[in-house]
Structures are given as structure tokens and as C-alpha cells.
Regions:
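Extracellular jelly-roll beta-sandwich "head" domains, especially the C-terminal globular C1q domain
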Residues: 2, 26, 56-61, 76-78, ...
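Extracellular "spike/adhesin" assembly and maturation modules
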Residues: 1-45
């Protein structure tokens, strides 16, 4: 297919071409797959409102990728035996990612804190910056060190997307 590109870069057939839905959808799927196939690792900054946590021998694994003006990311924190959890409300700063659109509050869709079979859902909120406070979804109160008794082996994961500027 001879293609033209829109301002966003997505392929579409030239108006002089005979439409071929299967071919055109494959071209679009190939384009999107090439755009999303490689995630970029990053290291978010984990802070708290009173005393900052320290990951110690735990791990923070994070990656992001961008399609058009949407940025997708995932963060997984696994507490180790020397992880300290700080005190106060938690915030993750998405260091190195594209800046969100200013002037609109973007709720990050999903997060979960897991301890064995128990879990707590929470949301994040971006408001024109890369600093993302975390909130427990049931009451929209801050996710904090006091929300649960954190321990070695506990995990919490954040997956989300937002509109970049």
C-alpha cells in the first residue's frame, strides 16, 4: 500500500488507491506493533509526605512506552528485608517520562497493593506534572505507610496511561 501519514504519523491509504480493508488494517497493526514493541525502563522516585521510604534490598521495576500522545507505564515495587516504608502519603514521580497535559487532572486507572491473598486497590492522579500521589479508591484518601502493615515480600503495582503534552 502506498501510504500517506497524518499529523500523528499513522498510516492510511492514498485516496487514489482501491480500498483493501485486510491490507490496510494489517499496515496499521504493523505500524502500531512497531511503535509499542519496545518499552523503555525508568526509575521512578518514591517519596512520602513525612519521611521518605528507602527500597533497600527490595526492587522497583518500571517501564513506559508511547503511542501517539498516550503514555503507558507500569511500576512494580517488591519490598525486601531492608526496605523502609517511610511515613505519610506516598507519591511516585515518573522521572524521565513525557510531561502530562497541563490543566487537566488525569486519574491513573489501576494499582494494587498485595500481601499474600489480601490486596488494596488505589489510584494515582497527575495534574500537569510527573509527580503522582496515590489514593485508596474506596475513600479517595492518601495511600500511606499507615494504610497497611508493610512487610518484606509485599508488592504494589501501578499500571496506567495519561495524555502527554
Amino acid at each position: 500500500m502506498a501510504t500517506l501519514a497524518t499529523a500523528s504519523g499513522y498510516p492510511y491509504p492514498a485516496t487514489s488507491e482501491t480500498p483493501d480493508v485486510q491490507r490496510d488494517l494489517k499496515a496499521l497493526a504493523d505500524y502500531l506493533e512497531a511503535k509499542t514493541a519496545t518499552a523503555t525502563a525508568f526509575t521512578p522516585t518514591w517519596t512520602a509526605s513525612t519521611t521518605n521510604p528507602a527500597i533497600g534490598n527490595g526492587t522497583i521495576a518500571a517501564a513506559w512506552w508511547k503511542v501517539g500522545n498516550l503514555v503507558f507505564f507500569r511500576i512494580k515495587v517488591t519490598a525486601g528485608s531492608t526496605t523502609t516504608f517511610g511515613t505519610g502519603s506516598y507519591t511516585f514521580t515518573l522521572t524521565g517520562l513525557p510531561t502530562p497535559v497541563a490543566g487537566i487532572r488525569q486519574v491513573i486507572p489501576a494499582g494494587i497493593y498485595a500481601r499474600g491473598a489480601a490486596s488494596t486497590a488505589f489510584q494515582g492522579l497527575l495534574n500537569g506534572s510527573l509527580a503522582m500521589p496515590l489514593y485508596v479508591t474506596t475513600a479517595f484518601t492518601a495511600l500511606a505507610s499507615t494504610t497497611a502493615a508493610w512487610a518484606s515480600g509485599d508488592t504494589f503495582e501501578i499500571t496506567g496511561h495519561y495524555m502527554a503534552a
